[in-house]
Amino acid sequence: MIESEASVKGRVVAEMLSHFTNDLKIGKKIKSGELRKRMIEPPWIPPAMFNLTGINMDHFTMKLLSLKENPNMDYVILQLHGGGYTGAVRNAYYVFAGLYNELSHGCNVLTPDYRVAPENPYPAALEDALASYRWLLSKGYYGEQIILAGDSAGGGLAMALCM
């Protein structure tokens, strides 16, 4: 009985999603990535207690959020953003970085803006996540000092990095 209920729920959700994504006006824009490209945000300005440092990598950029005074260098958080592997990092993730910093008693938070599909299909995002991890190693952190954090697609990347 539970299995059939899940199947019914699954069919309902799938049907609702198909109506939304197949809509002639919006569906094409979602599938092509046009809707995602038009989402423009102003640059995020960190609270006064933080430095936000941009880092250019070969194929992507990263931002390192750190306290201006007395950062906790014992650990670092590698935050991998969500977005279904199709969305760029959003300002909300820098807000999350500040929360991670607070909850970890001042640890730095590195947030890569990894390459996304459809322009950069798999394994581009994973390669960029791995490059971010290796960058932290090159800065003197050991693997056991790097805390992975991610939601949605970022959670998948975090799990893949652990493998």
Feature annotation, model-predicted:
Residues 84-87, 91-92, 109, 135:
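Serine-hydrolase catalytic-loop signature spanning alpha/beta hydrolases and amidase-signature enzymes
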Residues 49, 59, 106, 143-145:
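A generic structural signal for alpha->beta connector loops
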Residues 91-111:
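Short amphipathic alpha-helix adjacent to the substrate-entry channel of hydrolases
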Residues 85-86, 115-119:
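Short strand->helix junction
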